[in-house]
Amino acid sequence: MQLTGAEIICECLLEQGVDTVFGYPGGAALNTYDALYKYSDKIRHILTAHEQGASHAADGYARATGKTGVVMTTSGPGATNIVTGLATANIDSIPLVAITGNVTTDQLGRDSFQEVDIVNIVKPVTKASFLVEKVEDLADTIRKAFALAQHGRKGPVLVDVPKDVTANKTEFVQTIPERPRTFEIRNPEKVRVVQEMIKNAKCPMIYAGGGIISADASEEFKAFAELIDAPVCCSLMGLGCIPADHPLCVGNIGMHGGY
């Protein structure tokens, strides 16, 4: 079926199971927002007072739900205002996809009104960033962005979409998105070595990180700590992997420690 680039963005979001996006509209993103209104029965848009707030809200949503957070903004300051949110998600390994508007492709690189090279600006604080210059490439780029955000060490990915790309039409074919790969034990022998080390430890202590929470393994981790009767200290990202009032929990350590 023939769809505009803006409609393709919405269809790709639905493919990925997205039901909530955070953002702040502007001129270069109006086509996308017009399409988003047509999809409002399936995709909820939460308007924030500032783009930075939208990026942090998408980050928090991803942490709370385990889903990939999505933030939408316009070009120029709309795009640069989300850099701090992207950096936060990058450092903490939070899956996030940012979709930004930009000036039309014929105006790129001409110092146009509210034009910045956001793709290169965010490279140090994202897993990847893409500029889509043809509507035919849009769907595959968004799908790739979600795959990158969700696979391996999770993190933010930015897709920059010029205004004419969101207005142009092309054929769209729905696909079943690739699901994140499950973890595999690739070296059972090393696991057995670790088991022996834990078994023979005289005073074992566990330093727990955020991977436990992102893997939704808090209950299993608590059972493991109780089984070997080891006190648990946490990194900043690991806080919450075991209840703070649990007898084995000794809280955070280091300069941010509370014990």
Question: What feature does the model see in each segment?
Answer:
Residues 1-259:
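N-terminal alpha/beta PP-like core and its mobile active-site loop of ThDP/TPP-dependent enzymes
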